[in-house]
From Swiss-Prot:
Organism field: Danio rerio (Zebrafish)
Compositionally biased spans, kind Low complexity: 139-150
UniProt-listed Pfam families: Exo_endo_phos (PF03372)
Region feature Disordered, mapped onto this chain: 1-22, 63-92, 109-155
GO MF annotation, one: catalytic activity
Chain intervals with Polar residues compositional bias: 63-72
Record family assignment: Belongs to the CCR4/nocturin family.
One GO-annotated biological process of the protein: 3'-UTR-mediated mRNA stabilization
UniProt-recorded name of the protein: Protein angel homolog 2
Length: 569
């Protein structure tokens, strides 16, 4: 999830498992549907909780550097104290504490036009100049919030004192074993047993320190030491080492920390690291990291969504795709295509999100294509800034999206009521982008087939629908098994929802597979297990995220898959 000046006034998770009754709702009021399946009662189960000044974790910490002493001034709107001169904050940034010279614009809730996107964090202006405003310590005065909060969020004083004076317990997560639902017997061919290849995958938004410093109002519930990079980094590395995933897809990886600390630490643990920084001088990016003893790198393909001269593609988000070869001397295994991305946050720019996703899917289709025109197994991980069962989510899983008359603000499902009346244009992205409405490069089709498809392509650009050819399934069900409550992957002072996913090419017979979208065993993956997510009650007990044990405002997703050997030729 993007942390920025324009945070959701009505950020929500308007999704839930069908048939679940809302017990102890997390969010302050019911949310409208996005106008697509599942039915209204499904979406009504999800709520959003945010009410500044009433959340138990929104009391601002005293940002005092341990080695600094200076007078502070009280800012208007009851903002927390900060140094009077922002240009003296450079020493704070070097040590990883909060104040930051890079600034933020006011919330897009104060913008003149609801059709205009909110400005990006530290985004260059049209003249190429970077804003020098001070960090945003509190949400804008005019920002809106839901009408109410759960009872446990209203009792600020007692909970706050308890959490600030006593140790916070560790968040308990258990492993969900699904292996008994998979066909575990090894295949037998020509008298030889061919054992499958099992491996683990993690997706984790580790929270860039620069973005944290730019958006301190999101972390008022935290004690300042919790937010110090000198404390966060050891926790994050310890977490990565503890889970020891064979493949890790990380988002919000800050480039200087990556080069100086993260990459050396992980390389010492036997990992190979690939990194792609966001464009436009942004400080963070995406990384794909894998164990050298389990995989070898076939190719690496960074994806930049920024396209000069294409107004829709003027944002600096990126993706990173690697093609990996499993290392097993005894059997022949298919390559695995691993994609990692962090899509645009802005809830009102679903058109940009879909265009970014289309570019990523086009590159995945190219990289994963096999000589027989089929595709190797695909893993698609990342922070998609979209909730389950939103139109963007359904597009990934169902391979098609009919968007005729769809409001742009409903694409990601992040907001209850989209502001503005803009709907998705037909087509969403221009032909000059070079991506067809089937999310493939237009020059990817062979010349012999191109003439037969020219008319179809022309017609597709006038239809209000998009498609892709990948068969993808979510590794998580998005509701808790015991209570049916919504799973949470990200949580801070203003929201708690699911935006992080691991999608995969499900093999026939996989526990999460949709039968019509399943792949042959050697061209797909079977889900063996996953690290369970948590809900509202569990986060309440640990004072939300980040905390002294969990150093990001996201939780890591961790799964284990099985790849079956290829048949002998």
């Amino acid at each position: 999830m993007r942390k920025g000046r324009h945070m959701p006034r009505h950020t929500n998770a308007n999704y839930a498992r069908p048939g679940v009754s809302p017990n102890h709702p997390m969010f302050g009021r019911y949310l409208s549907t996005v106008g697509f399946p599942p039915a209204q009662n499904v979406y009504n189960h999800w709520r959003h909780w945010y009410q500044p000044g009433h959340l138990w974790w929104t009391q601002p910490p005293q940002l005092q550097h341990p080695s600094s002493s200076f007078s502070t001034v009280r800012h208007p709107f009851n903002r927390p104290p900060r140094p009077p001169d922002p240009y003296q904050w450079s020493s704070w940034r070097q040590t990883g504490v909060l104040p930051h010279t890079r600034g933020l614009h006011l919330s897009a809730g104060l913008m003149e036009s609801t059709d205009r996107p909110p400005p990006q964090k530290r985004r260059k202006s049209a003249e190429g100049e970077i804003s020098q405003r001070s960090p945003q310590h509190s949400p804008p005065k005019g920002s809106r919030s839901p009408k109410g909060s759960p009872e446990w969020l209203r009792n600020v004083s007692s909970i706050e004192v308890a959490n600030r004076t006593s140790a916070v317990p560790e968040l308990k997560r258990h492993w969900e074993d699904l292996s008994h639902l998979c066909k575990a017997a090894p295949s037998v061919n020509r008298g030889k047993q061919k054992w499958p290849f099992d491996f683990s995958v993690m997706s984790y938004n580790i929270l860039s320190q620069d973005l944290l410093c730019d958006n301190t109002y999101l972390y008022r519930h935290c004690n300042p030491p919790v937010l110090d990079w000198r404390n966060r980094f050891p926790n994050i590395i310890k977490e990565l080492e503890q889970y020891s995933a064979d493949i890790m897809c990380l988002q919000e990886v800050q480039e200087d920390h990556y080069k100086q600390q993260i990459k050396p630490s992980l390389e010492s643990l036997g990992y190979h690291c690939e990194f792609k920084r966001r464009t436009g001088l942004k400080p963070d990016g995406c990384a794909v990291i894998f164990k050298r003893e389990r995989f070898s790198l076939v190719s690496c393909h960074p994806v930049e969504y920024f396209r000069r001269g294409v107004p829709l593609m003027d944002r600096d988000n990126v993706g990173l795709i690697v093609l990996l070869r499993p290392i097993d001397p005894h059997v022949s295994l298919s390559n695995i295509c691993v994609a990692n991305t962090h899509l645009l946050y802005n809830p009102r720019r679903g058109d940009i999100k879909l265009a970014q996703l289309a570019m990523l899917l086009a590159e995945i289709s190219r990289v994963s294509q096999l000589p027989d025109s089929s595709v190797c197994p695909v893993l698609l991980c990342g922070d998609f800034n979209s909730v389950p069962w939103s139109p963007l989510y359904r597009f990934i899983k169902d391979r098609r999206l009919d968007y005729d008359g769809m409001p742009i603000g409903k694409v990601s499902g992040q907001e209850e009521t989209p502001r503005g009346q803009r709907i998705l244009t037909v087509p969403i992205w221009p032909r000059s982008l070079g991506i067809s409405q089937q999310c493939q490069y237009e020059n990817q089709t062979r010349d012999s087939e191109l003439r037969d498809l020219e008319q179809t392509e022309r017609e597709s650009f006038t239809e209000a629908s998009i498609e892709h050819c990948l068969r993808l399934t979510s590794a998580y069900s998005h509701h808790l098994k015991e209570s049916g409550q919504p799973e949470i992957t990200t949580c801070h002072s203003r929201t708690a929802i699911t935006v992080d996913y691991i999608f995969y090419s499900a093999a026939l017979g996989d526990v999460m597979a949709q039968a019509e979208y399943s792949a042959p065993p050697e061209r797909g993956l079977q889900l063996l297990g996953r690290l369970a997510l948590v809900g509202e009650k569990e986060l309440q007990k640990v004072n939300g995220l980040p905390n002294q044990h969990n150093s990001s405002d996201h939780l890591p997703l961790l799964t284990r898959f099985r790849l079956h050997p290829q048949a002998d030729s």
